[in-house]
Amino acid sequence: MTNIRKTHPLLKIVNTSFVDLPAPSSLSSWWNFGSLLTICLAVQIATGLFLAMHYTADIETAFSSVSHICRDVNYGWLLRYLHANGASMFFICLYLHVGRGLYYGSYMFLETWNVGVALLFAVMATAFLGYVLPWGQMSFWGATVITNLLSAIPYVGTDMVQWVWGGYAVDKATLTRFFAFHFILPFIIAALVMVHFLFLHETGSNNPTGIPSDLDLIPFHPYYTIKDILGFVFMLTALLTLVFFSPDLLGDPDNYSPANPLSTPLHIKPEWYFLFAYTILRSIPNKLGGVLALVLSILILVALPMLHTSKQRSMTFRPISQFLFWLLVADLLTLTWIGGQPVEHPYMLIGQTASILYFSLILIFMPLAGIAENHLMKW
């Protein structure tokens, strides 16, 4: 008798995706982050749903409702901090996932990669909207500064800002619509994840060597299910350690003060996971130029397949490209550090230098390294 998982219409889909899926035998731990991101999304949707039951999207009561969740709701503090720190874990896994794709040439799966970039934009938008909801000082001023960037768009900019705000300033209408979008976007992200999976399963996974692995495939279960469970344990341990021992480590103290339009914080900054892009934005004195650089700092990922010049897919056997890759990682960490510093000397100069290096590495040095390595290999 044939196993039910291979004949049942629904179980058959699960079986071909997670049980009998042929996977390369050489996948390292860097391939764990896709499954970790799925867990992160599930945690965020679950905690967010329960938080939404107690939160009120009104400027008069939003701050108080978050306080009420932490003080009066059973395990409300746990829900709130799981959600807030879960977002940080989400971005850690997301950036490592993208970095893995860059290092091992996974961007050569065009459809999967482009859907992934769309997912990155959607997750960043969701996180920004969520940061506004507690209606603290940094929520209010972050929303004001970031949405105001739309005014840099020629001709229609000012109208777009007022359209997003729902008035002439960040106010009640802004908070209401931000909550509505923050609620619906994770479900759109979940749908995009399905499309991401669909395209990935059309081609099969890449592997650390970058060489087609059709001759050496193993079933996903039990090998990679066990491996993924180990990843879940490590990630959830890190998340729970953060939540129970230092829940405010990655937050901003200013957000514990209710929003006050008459008092500007000394240093307006987004959450840590946006600081690298924020530095690039600040590095250009021109407003429109800064906004374009901000968007291009993420959109540049779409261009990676076109910038691939090496005859090898992965960087595993390409030492020059490896050096440039780790230089890019160091540059991104520098950008993140500078984003948290005030706009003054020497931070501005370091930020501008790091921003130029970021684009130069991706657009100029990495493609040149690929060509050089081809010549060195006499290809």
From Swiss-Prot:
Q: Name one GO molecular function term.
A: ubiquinol-cytochrome-c reductase activity
Give the binding site residues for heme b b562: H83, H182
Q: Which cofactor does it need?
A: heme b
Which InterPro entries does the entry link to? Answer: Cyt_b/b6_C (IPR005798), Cyt_b/b6_C_sf (IPR036150), Cyt_b/b6_N (IPR005797), Cytb/b6-like_sf (IPR027387), Cytochrome_b (IPR030689), Cytochrome_b_C_euk/bac (IPR048260), Cytochrome_b_N_euk/bac (IPR048259), Di-haem_cyt_TM (IPR016174)
Cofactor binding, note field:
Binds 2 heme b groups non-covalently.
Record localization = Mitochondrion inner membrane
Q: Which Pfam families does the entry mention? A: Cytochrom_B_C, Cytochrome_B
Q: Which GO BP annotation is one of this protein's?
A: mitochondrial electron transport, ubiquinol to cytochrome c
Q: How does it sit in the membrane?
A: Multi-pass membrane protein
| UniProt xrefs under CDD domains | cytochrome_b_C, Cytochrome_b_N
The record ties this protein, via Gene3D superfamilies, to: Cytochrome Bc1 Complex, Chain C
Q: What keywords would UniProt list here?
A: Electron transport, Heme, Iron, Membrane, Metal-binding, Mitochondrion, Mitochondrion inner membrane, Respiratory chain, Transmembrane, Transmembrane helix, Transport, Ubiquinone
Q: Which residues form the signal peptide?
A: none
Please list the residues that bind heme b b566.
H97, H196
Q: Which residues bind a ubiquinone?
A: H201
Q: Which residues cross the membrane?
A: 33-53, 77-98, 113-133, 178-198, 226-246, 288-308, 320-340, 347-367
Task: Report the function annotation for this chain.
Answer: Component of the ubiquinol-cytochrome c reductase complex (complex III or cytochrome b-c1 complex) that is part of the mitochondrial respiratory chain. The b-c1 complex mediates electron transfer from ubiquinol to cytochrome c. Contributes to the generation of a proton gradient across the mitochondrial membrane that is then used for ATP synthesis.
Q: Which PANTHER family match?
A: CYTOCHROME B
* Subunit description: The cytochrome bc1 complex contains 11 subunits: 3 respiratory subunits (MT-CYB, CYC1 and UQCRFS1), 2 core proteins (UQCRC1 and UQCRC2) and 6 low-molecular weight proteins (UQCRH/QCR6, UQCRB/QCR7, UQCRQ/QCR8, UQCR10/QCR9, UQCR11/QCR10 and a cleavage product of UQCRFS1). This cytochrome bc1 complex then forms a dimer.
Tell me what this protein is called. Cytochrome b
Organism equals: Mystacina tuberculata
Question: Gene for this protein?
Answer: MT-CYB
